[in-house]
Amino acid sequence: MARTKQTARKSTSIKAPRKQLAAKAARKSAPISGGIKKPHKFRPGTVALREIRKYQKTTDLLIRKLPFQRLVRDIAMEMKSDIRFQSQAILALQEAAEAYLVGLFEDTNLCAIHARRVTIMTKDLHLARRIRGERF
């Protein structure tokens, strides 16, 4: 039998939609897993090292100014009521406090490394302060 060319014709009759099987319908209605993108997870320690490099580059203050100011005023109220501070005085106190804390954590890290650890512990902090000659 010879082949004949078929041409597209517009359908005149309206067909009723077929009912889908329950399993097939459930698969179609379920969200596609490819559409939801999971957040990228870095390996443990990668973000910490990035933060260390970031904060070693910067020279700005690490503690927020207003909470530190409230802390200074709260401690000063215990000593003497009705005491005033210049903004430069609080800024100088904050610079000194941050320099002290950074140095203390450096010494604490050295104590942890001396104990063949990479995680600092309270005993490292106590040892660093003891070597410095501070009370705790």
From Swiss-Prot:
It is found in: Nucleus; Chromosome. SMART domains: H3. Residues 1-41 are annotated as: Disordered. Signal peptide: none annotated. Induction: Up-regulated in the absence of H3.3. GO terms for molecular function: DNA binding; protein heterodimerization activity; structural constituent of chromatin. It comes from the Eukaryota. Keywords: Chromosome, DNA-binding, Nucleosome core, Nucleus. One of its GO terms (cellular component) is nucleosome. The nucleosome is a histone octamer containing two molecules each of H2A, H2B, H3 and H4 assembled in one H3-H4 heterotetramer and two H2A-H2B heterodimers. The octamer wraps approximately 147 bp of DNA. Macronuclear replacement variant which replaces conventional H3 in a subset of nucleosomes. Nucleosomes wrap and compact DNA into chromatin, limiting DNA accessibility to the cellular machineries which require DNA as a template. Histones thereby play a central role in transcription regulation, DNA repair, DNA replication and chromosomal stability. DNA accessibility is regulated via a complex set of post-translational modifications of histones, also called histone code, and nucleosome remodeling. Functions redundantly to H3.3. Belongs to the histone H3 family. This is Histone H3.4. It comes from Tetrahymena thermophila (strain SB210). The gene is HHT4.
